[in-house]
Amino acid sequence: MLTLDKIYHAAFVLKDVVRETTLIPSPKISANNNIYLKTENLQVTGSFKVRGAGYMISQLSEEEKARGVVACSAGNHAQGVALAAQKYGIKATICLPDGAPISKVEATKSYGAEVVMVKGVYDDAYKRALELRDEKGLTFVHPFDDDDVIAGQATIALEILNNMKNIDAVVVPVGGGGLISGIAYAIKHLAPHIKVYGVQALGAPSMYNSLKGGSIETLASVSTIADGIAVKRPGDNTFKMCSQYVDEVITVTEGEISSAILALIEQHKMIAEGAGAVAVAAAMFDKIPMKNKNIVCVVSGGNIDVTILSRVIERGLLTSGRTCNLCIELMDKPGQLQAVSAIFASLGANIISVHHERASEAMDINGCYLRIVLETRNYEHIDMITTALKDAGFRLV
């Protein structure tokens, strides 16, 4: 059973295992609220997950420690369990979905754990971990639906409350619900006036749908760059706790997540993974139902694969109006490309790439398409460019 005493005990046990992460202001994230970032992406292993895993493993009996532990994860919980097991001299077996980022797989191995790759998503890895538990007598370290794990995650709330006064809301990423359950439980018992909002990716809204429907819903599939919260089904305990203590769960799109990752890089020189950036995305795109309030966004992790990061940055630039794709119909005669380029130059747009296309059934026999990618300042700048092109007689396709 989760209690405040258990959470305070977790904070005591974890003081030599985890670091107390900083709480920093982020004045440019939102024009409507005062945003502060709880930087769990700078935690040991790059994620908050080591808190819950560390506390749960610390509470095992000597017999359980001797047999070893097994866990499943989209990546971050794996590293937390692996590091905690290493600290206590315990053998750890970790089941990972085969789509887990390479960076997380290699990091898990680096802490000495045995990694078992499982075809599918988190829920498939979960099933395999339970099979190994039964076959080998291992202790299963649940990534979210366990009171000790939730107590470990709740220590984040204690740090937030100790480091900042006059908080109006805390915004938390939601996958299976362990992180937000712990934070919401602690906050509603210690400072019940503070609102707690959860954020899920639109492509993996299991807790959002479950709370809206009033019962646990299992999704047929999930698809999101926020792999750390790509969970088909919330936990039984976490669903009950979220129903009781969380004020609202909201969703953000893939483009909004990408924009948030980009904003953190540019404004704070900080790397966040997709799951870690969803709370910031909610603040950036005014999804939080508050104005002129002090809001803490939990940046839950920073373990993003560099190949994914490059694609996310490209998408973030596109979503925020920093790049744009145009298709312009031209007459196939000399000087047309020069005329278009002159418009771009006069408005300060930089050409990234150009593709000249003559063969298309849709165009006039004497025409051609110019497909072009531009570096722009914002959406207003894009509007200026498209207006200038139309005024010059060019047709946008």
Listing of model-derived features with the role each one plays in the protein:
Residues 1-397:
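PLP-dependent amino-acid enzyme catalytic core
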